[in-house]
Amino acid sequence: MFEPMELTNDAVIKVIGVGGGGGNAVEHMVRERIEGVDFFAVNTDAQALRKTAVGQTIQIGSGITKGLGAGANPEVGRHSAEEDREALRAALEGADMVFIAAGMGGGTGTGAAPVVAEVAKDQGILTVAVVAKPFNFEGKKRMAFAEQGIAELSKHVDSLITIPNDKLLKVLGRGISLLDAFGAANDVLKGAVQGIAELITRPGLMNVDFADVRTVMSEMGYAMMGSGVACGEDRAEEAAEMAISSPLLEDIDLSGARGVLVNITAGFDLRLDEFETVGNTIRAFASDNATVVIGTSLDPDMNDELRVTVVATGIGMDKRPEITLVTNKQSSQRVMDNLYRDHAAGMSSLNQEQKTAAKAVNEQNAQGSKEPDYLDIPAFLRKQAD
């Protein structure tokens, strides 16, 4: 006798914020109510975990730090994560994809994030890390810690995105508040996570499953993520331009990107010519040797809005001779033959251990300095300023 079997095809996506900065980034996404994603905060600081809005928390290294934090010592952060390795493994169990958010240069984020990534990879989980580098005024020692942490983290992730905090001043201007600056950077990570989640879970005209996402995201190396939202007659072009602009990310040559993932989310009013516009806008940034996955998601709540999410992976790796195009369920080679190449965006995190950052930024404001070159700012940011 045959019995009905319940099918569960949804991929499980988890976002782990490690340390003060990573925890703040994840808390930002929780408040934005992203659907289809599980959120966790990992920290040595018991007080920070008690205050967070993230529902699932893991305190690590209580036997080492007594819940008082890592004291800006990455070794303490690493040993703390090792001490509670089993708790981390249990939290990650069942995940298909994990995003790790952390601020580099301090104790917990720098030391524990590589351990979290290693635990995830040991379980065969697709692992992507998004980390922030400290301001230059925080000193050479903290920057050295950050570089060491990033190097160690890169050994255990499929894709790695880095964001120098110094880019916040250059791109957003010296008049912006500290909270607004970090919030803008966190919005980029939120958009990327949201875009991938929607790509997998929402119905669309061109459905993309998790296997397609894994194909792109497993291209080892540095990665870029970007998301843009626009309204009106030119919404497709404007959203695509925002998605491929990555002013807050590390300066990396994207011409060698080996994987490209594109998602277009809109209401039922999405037009064919808008789909083509997105493809043509991004086309100039495409690598000739990229595996490309494209898809659309329909959101009835987006009346006049159109959102484009772009992910480029495998940056800095050797180029492959072949070109692979993946458009699951329907073909769209005419529109997206060689999709993508350039800047997408990441996240930055508000590090609770860096109270001096606000004071230093204000002092620089008082001293005054030249505004960044107008033409150095991406078009969508110039439009907002004008």
Swiss-Prot record:
<dbReference type="InterPro" id="IPR003008">
    <property type="entry name" value="Tubulin_FtsZ_GTPase"/>
</dbReference>
<feature type="binding site">
    <location>
        <position position="142"/>
    </location>
    <ligand>
        <name>GTP</name>
    </ligand>
</feature>
<feature type="binding site">
    <location>
        <begin position="20"/>
        <end position="24"/>
    </location>
    <ligand>
        <name>GTP</name>
    </ligand>
</feature>
<dbReference type="Pfam" id="PF00091">
    <property type="entry name" value="Tubulin"/>
</dbReference>
<keyword id="KW-0963">Cytoplasm</keyword>
<dbReference type="GO" id="GO:0032153">
    <property type="term" value="C:cell division site"/>
</dbReference>
<comment type="function">
    <text>Essential cell division protein that forms a contractile ring structure (Z ring) at the future cell division site. The regulation of the ring assembly controls the timing and the location of cell division. One of the functions of the FtsZ ring is to recruit other cell division proteins to the septum to produce a new cell wall between the dividing cells. Binds GTP and shows GTPase activity.</text>
</comment>
<dbReference type="InterPro" id="IPR000158">
    <property type="entry name" value="Cell_div_FtsZ"/>
</dbReference>
<dbReference type="InterPro" id="IPR018316">
    <property type="entry name" value="Tubulin/FtsZ_2-layer-sand-dom"/>
</dbReference>
<dbReference type="GO" id="GO:0005525">
    <property type="term" value="F:GTP binding"/>
</dbReference>
<dbReference type="Pfam" id="PF12327">
    <property type="entry name" value="FtsZ_C"/>
</dbReference>
<comment type="subunit">
    <text>Homodimer. Polymerizes to form a dynamic ring structure in a strictly GTP-dependent manner. Interacts directly with several other division proteins.</text>
</comment>
<dbReference type="InterPro" id="IPR024757">
    <property type="entry name" value="FtsZ_C"/>
</dbReference>
<dbReference type="GO" id="GO:0003924">
    <property type="term" value="F:GTPase activity"/>
</dbReference>
<feature type="binding site">
    <location>
        <begin position="107"/>
        <end position="109"/>
    </location>
    <ligand>
        <name>GTP</name>
    </ligand>
</feature>
<dbReference type="InterPro" id="IPR008280">
    <property type="entry name" value="Tub_FtsZ_C"/>
</dbReference>
<keyword id="KW-0132">Cell division</keyword>
<keyword id="KW-0717">Septation</keyword>
<dbReference type="InterPro" id="IPR020805">
    <property type="entry name" value="Cell_div_FtsZ_CS"/>
</dbReference>
<feature type="binding site">
    <location>
        <position position="138"/>
    </location>
    <ligand>
        <name>GTP</name>
    </ligand>
</feature>
<keyword id="KW-0342">GTP-binding</keyword>
<dbReference type="GO" id="GO:0000917">
    <property type="term" value="P:division septum assembly"/>
</dbReference>
<dbReference type="InterPro" id="IPR036525">
    <property type="entry name" value="Tubulin/FtsZ_GTPase_sf"/>
</dbReference>
<dbReference type="GO" id="GO:0043093">
    <property type="term" value="P:FtsZ-dependent cytokinesis"/>
</dbReference>
<dbReference type="InterPro" id="IPR045061">
    <property type="entry name" value="FtsZ/CetZ"/>
</dbReference>
<protein>
    <recommendedName>
        <fullName>Cell division protein FtsZ</fullName>
    </recommendedName>
</protein>
<feature type="binding site">
    <location>
        <position position="186"/>
    </location>
    <ligand>
        <name>GTP</name>
    </ligand>
</feature>
<dbReference type="GO" id="GO:0051258">
    <property type="term" value="P:protein polymerization"/>
</dbReference>
<feature type="region of interest" description="Disordered">
    <location>
        <begin position="350"/>
        <end position="377"/>
    </location>
</feature>
<dbReference type="GO" id="GO:0005737">
    <property type="term" value="C:cytoplasm"/>
</dbReference>
<keyword id="KW-0131">Cell cycle</keyword>
<comment type="similarity">
    <text>Belongs to the FtsZ family.</text>
</comment>
<dbReference type="InterPro" id="IPR037103">
    <property type="entry name" value="Tubulin/FtsZ-like_C"/>
</dbReference>
<keyword id="KW-0547">Nucleotide-binding</keyword>
